C-alpha cells in the first residue's frame, strides 16, 4: 500500500492532515489504498493536464484519474493550489479548509463518486461536508497508525 503526496509548489500544505483526510474517505467509503498519488501543483500544470486529457484549456481545482475497478484504489489526482487559493477567497473560507475539501473531493472521485449530474453534485457535496466535519472533530486526536507507506515529496 502506498500513499504519496507531492507538492511541486512553494506553498506550504498540511501534509499530515491531507493524508488523514484521504485515509478517512477511502476507509469510510469501504475501500483500501493500493497506490494513491496526490500532486499539489500550480495553474500551469493543472491547465496542461486539463487540456491534454479533458480538452479543457483552463486550470481547474482538481483532476482525478482512477485506474482501479475493485475495492483496492489505484489512482492519482492533481490539485491546483492557485485555484484553491482563489476559491478560498471566493467562498470566504481558509486556504486549508478549501484544500481539505478539494482533497476529500478527489478521494471521493477515487472511490467512484461522480459529480456530472445535479443530483450527483448534491450527494458529493454532502459527503464532502460530512468528511470535512469529521476531520475537524478529529483535529485534536492523534492520527491512527497506518500500514500504508506515506511519502511526502517535493519537486520544485
Curated annotation (Swiss-Prot):
HAMAP family: Endoribonucl_YbeY
EC number(s) stated in the UniProt entry for this protein: 3.1.-.-
GO molecular function: metalloendopeptidase activity; RNA endonuclease activity; zinc ion binding
Task of the protein: Single strand-specific metallo-endoribonuclease involved in late-stage 70S ribosome quality control and in maturation of the 3' terminus of the 16S rRNA.
Subcellular location: Cytoplasm
Required cofactor names: Zn(2+)
Cross-referenced SUPFAM superfamilies: Metalloproteases ('zincins'), catalytic domain (SSF55486)
Lineage: Bacteria, Pseudomonadati, Chlorobiota, Chlorobiia, Chlorobiales
Protein name listed in UniProt: Endoribonuclease YbeY
Record-level GO cellular component terms: cytoplasm
Domain of life: Bacteria
Enzyme class (EC, first level): hydrolase
Disulfide bonds: none
Pfam annotation, one family: YbeY
Any one of the GO BP annotations: rRNA processing
Transmembrane segment boundaries: none
Keyword Transmembrane attached: no
Alphabetical list of InterPro entries matching this protein: MetalPrtase_cat_dom_sf_prd (IPR023091), YbeY (IPR002036)
Keywords, sorted A to Z: Cytoplasm, Endonuclease, Hydrolase, Metal-binding, Nuclease, Ribosome biogenesis, rRNA processing, Zinc
Gene responsible for this protein: ybeY
Family: Belongs to the endoribonuclease YbeY family.
Cofactor note text: Binds 1 zinc ion.
Annotated positions binding Zn(2+): 105, 109, 115
Amino acid at each position: 500500500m502506498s500513499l504519496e503526496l507531492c507538492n511541486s509548489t512553494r506553498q506550504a500544505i498540511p501534509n499530515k492532515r491531507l493524508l488523514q483526510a484521504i485515509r478517512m474517505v477511502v476507509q469510510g467509503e469501504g475501500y483500501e489504498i493500493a497506490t494513491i498519488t496526490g500532486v499539489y501543483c500550480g495553474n500551469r500544470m493543472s491547465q496542461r493536464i486539463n487540456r491534454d486529457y479533458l480538452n479543457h484549456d483552463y486550470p481547474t481545482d482538481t483532476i482525478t484519474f482512477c485506474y482501479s475497478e475493485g475495492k483496492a484504489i489505484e489512482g492519482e489526482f492533481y490539485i491546483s493550489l492557485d485555484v484553491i487559493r482563489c476559491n478560498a477567497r471566493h467562498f470566504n473560507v481558509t486556504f486549508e479548509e478549501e484544500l481539505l475539501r478539494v482533497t476529500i473531493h478527489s478521494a471521493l472521485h477515487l472511490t467512484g463518486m461522480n459529480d456530472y449530474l445535479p443530483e450527483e453534485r448534491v450527494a458529493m457535496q454532502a459527503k464532502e461536508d460530512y468528511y470535512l466535519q469529521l476531520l475537524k472533530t478529529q483535529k485534536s486526536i492523534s492520527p491512527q497508525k497506518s500500514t500504508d507507506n506515506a511519502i511526502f515529496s517535493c519537486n520544485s
